[in-house]
UniProtKB/Swiss-Prot annotation:
Pfam families in the cross-refs: DHDPS
Protein name, entry field: 4-hydroxy-tetrahydrodipicolinate synthase
Source organism of the structure: Syntrophus aciditrophicus (strain SB)
Its biological purpose: Catalyzes the condensation of (S)-aspartate-beta-semialdehyde [(S)-ASA] and pyruvate to 4-hydroxy-tetrahydrodipicolinate (HTPA).
Keywords attached to this entry: Amino-acid biosynthesis, Cytoplasm, Diaminopimelate biosynthesis, Lyase, Lysine biosynthesis, Schiff base
HAMAP family, alphabetized: DapA
Subunit composition and interactions: Homotetramer; dimer of dimers.
Residues reported to bind pyruvate: T44, I202
UniProt similarity note: Belongs to the DapA family.
Entry keyword Amino-acid biosynthesis: yes
Metabolic or biological pathway: Amino-acid biosynthesis; L-lysine biosynthesis via DAP pathway; (S)-tetrahydrodipicolinate from L-aspartate: step 3/4
Amino acid sequence: MFKGAIVAIVTPFKNGEIDEPALRDLIEFQIENGTDGIVPCGTTGESATLSHEEHDRVIEITIDAVRKRVPVIAGTGSNSTVEAMRLTKHAHEAGADGVLVVAPYYNRPTQEGLYQHYKALAESVPIPIIPYNIPSRTGVNILPETVARLAKISNIVGIKEASGSLKQMNDVIRLCDDGFSVLSGDDFFTLPLLTLGGKGVISVISNVAPADMACLVDAFEAGNMKKARAMHDKMVPLVDALFIETNPTPVKAALALMGKISEDVRLPLYRMTETSREKLKRVMQNYGLIG
């Protein structure tokens, strides 16, 4: 079962190319600070602007750098089922422990189309699959009843839920067996989802504060709700600041302020405004991440 504090890791760039040394350093930073798993090539990893070759390479680098210390769940989604199959097959052959597959975007399939998309993937590659529901980006919502159907497929093992609806998340948990991992796709909903029976989070804030998100999840699992609530409250201002502009622009700016990477993003994403940067910087100073 995939659970705990899992990071949706950024893809660092330098002079327009993947910065492999920086990516390897980020992975060490994550593992040293208690992260339970790493997701390369997700939304936060700018998968949409990676070439096919770069996408494959980022996954390979991550698997090599992690060295089986924590699970690697590779982002392999596409709005083409055939392309998602290719990406998923590569991740499996490269040694990924699982794949995160965003719902097909732009073409807006029906619920039956979504079911058949994931079913075809599951039948084509023998790897644990986590569908990713984020209607605000994809234009389609994987409904709880569809998730319940998917959960009956043996290698569809969980879902990253970013619908923004706790009611929907609760319905998914209610309709699926306890072994099905419902993971928050929104840092703010991590603690509320855990209280409903969720298993963890695929996190953006973990890029900059991995120990704190790991602490929240560990405290909850240990039954220390007071500590879990304190960590939640501590992180809320930073979560807000990391979404002051389109993800992953702010989190890359934050990592740059911490001296870990260049803040380069690829067009059509663009660097932060100075107003947003100053707001982010103040929050990070108050949080203790920078001086």
